[in-house]
Amino acid sequence: MDPGECTCMSGGICICGDNCKCTTCSCKTCRKSCCPCCPPGCAKCARGCICKGGSDKCSCCP
């Protein structure tokens, strides 16, 4: 499967795993993978967030 595509658009469990790069993915398990700069413990990370500061800080997390 192309890592840019995701078959899970309605939430729930997903087969994309850590390779999910899709911005329209609704899978709970893909949320962090779609924002690589988000710290592992951040619960506020959202899909489509912006990485700033050299991709080491997420716009959704403090």
UniProtKB/Swiss-Prot annotation:
A divalent metal cation 5 binds at residues 35, 37-38, 51. One of its GO terms (biological process) is intracellular monoatomic cation homeostasis. One of its GO terms (molecular function) is metal ion binding. InterPro entries: Metalthion_dom_sf, Metalthion_dom_sf_vert, Metalthion_vert, Metalthion_vert_metal_BS. A divalent metal cation 1 binds at residues 6, 8, 22, 25. Expressed exclusively in stratified squamous epithelia associated with oral epithelia, esophagus, upper stomach, tail, footpads and neonatal skin. Disulfide bonds: none annotated. A divalent metal cation 3 binds at residues 16, 20, 25, 30. PROSITE patterns: METALLOTHIONEIN_VRT. Keywords: Copper, Metal-binding, Metal-thiolate cluster, Zinc. This is Metallothionein-4.
